[in-house]
């Protein structure tokens, strides 16, 4: 990394504008080649200070409820698509206020709210989420098609006679996968729901497309989009979240102490449980600049956070020299599913949020403190 972080407080999330633009340009090229529309999935990345930049390349946002819908409406000002497994009565007025596309999870919810949507005076397009009962995701916590899933309408539950007023259909069955998975999934969707898609204005491929990953097959994605457009005559939407922010950000941490207990241990000011929860949830081991796998380099350490959770362990890493108090460690690919999922368990402060651009250098966008911790409690 070529950014001087010597003055950066830790822990801090740091997003590099140059890397973000690189991803956005690639996504924009898919739009230009196909005519599809691409939305930012805010559930993965909601750093709204960069929404004006993202708006130059993408068509809007997709939201998982009224809070995200309002954020996208106020901060990006383009298309706002909103989906939730169920909408509550008291929030529907705001969902309508901030959305121009609403996707319902069941025919019951559609029938419950369709009159309210129609009488709102807004030009809102409505859709239904499909569950084609096909997915190639191995981790059930991220698999919307596992047995007993609450997400989407299965072929057995589909009611063709209830489609009046429905403008589009939506499926989201992928998680950080390549376009060959999409190609196979689209075949199942076509076989199962194709006759209904032909009645629609749009088809939303959902998210989970790892489009900006170095080995992603763009040409297969292009073919899938063109197949849907040619076969059904629909506008195709994609909703990447992680792909927008993939490899654009870092989490900068400081070593607080080193101890021994049968192995070298280092305690950081950064918590897996609080600041990068997917490390424990997935689980996975994030890359650190200059570090190796255990025993690859001369000194191996287990890195842990400062909370009282015994399992607040980031992972085992090796280094060329011994770690010492004050050393800074830089975790890679920390822009997505971090800021949106972090928490203040144990009274942990939230990491600062920083942004680097060639025009303005390194800027601290936001810092947090006691009032942020206290304001969530009562």
Enumerate the predicted regions with their spans.
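Short, well-ordered secondary-structure micro-motifs
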Residues: 51, 137-140, 179-181, 213-216, ...
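Glycine-rich beta-alpha junction loops
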Residues: 130-134, 173-177, 209, 242-244, ...
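Active-site-proximal beta-alpha core segment in soluble small-molecule metabolic enzymes
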Residues: 36-202, 216, 224
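Acidic, glycine-rich loop-and-beta core segments that form the ion-binding/anion-interacting portion
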Residues: 186-246
């Amino acid at each position: 990394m070529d950014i001087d972080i010597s003055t950066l407080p830790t822990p801090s999330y740091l997003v590099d504008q140059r890397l973000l633009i690189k991803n956005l340009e690639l996504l924009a090229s898919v739009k230009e080649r196909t005519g599809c529309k691409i939305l930012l999935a805010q559930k993965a990345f909601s750093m709204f200070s960069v929404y004006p930049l993202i708006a130059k390349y993408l068509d809007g946002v997709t939201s998982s409820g009224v809070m995200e819908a309002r954020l996208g409406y106020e901060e990006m000002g383009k298309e706002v698509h909103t989906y939730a497994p169920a909408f509550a009565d008291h929030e529907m007025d705001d969902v309508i206020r901030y959305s121009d596309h609403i996707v319902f999870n069941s025919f019951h919810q559609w029938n419950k709210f369709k009159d309210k949507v129609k009488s709102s005076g807004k030009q809102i397009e409505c859709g239904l989420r499909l569950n084609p009962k096909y997915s190639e995701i191995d981790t059930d916590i991220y698999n919307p098609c596992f047995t007993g899933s609450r997400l989407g309408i299965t072929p057995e539950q589909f009611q063709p006679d209830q489609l009046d007023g429905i403008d589009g259909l939506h499926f989201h069955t992928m998680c950080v996968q390549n376009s060959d998975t999409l190609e196979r999934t689209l075949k199942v969707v076509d076989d199962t729901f194709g006759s209904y898609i032909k009645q629609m204005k749009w088809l939303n491929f959902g998210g989970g497309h790892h489009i900006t990953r170095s080995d992603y097959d763009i040409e297969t994605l292009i073919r899938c989009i063109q197949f849907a457009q040619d076969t059904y005559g629909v506008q195709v939407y994609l909703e990447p979240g992680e792909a927008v922010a993939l490899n654009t950000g870092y989490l900068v941490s400081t070593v607080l102490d080193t101890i021994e207990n049968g192995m070298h241990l280092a305690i950081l000011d950064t918590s897996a449980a609080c600041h990068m929860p997917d490390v424990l949830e997935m689980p996975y081991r994030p890359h650190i600049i200059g570090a190796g796998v255990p025993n690859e380099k001369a000194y191996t350490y287990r890195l842990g956070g400062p909370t009282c959770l015994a399992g607040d362990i980031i992972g085992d890493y090796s280094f060329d020299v011994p770690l010492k108090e004050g050393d800074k460690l830089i975790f890679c690919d920390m822009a997505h599913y971090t800021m949106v999922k972090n928490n203040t368990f144990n009274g942990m402060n939230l990491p600062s949020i920083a942004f680097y651009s060639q025009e303005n250098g390194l800027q601290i966008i936001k810092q947090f403190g006691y009032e942020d911790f206290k304001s969530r409690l009562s």
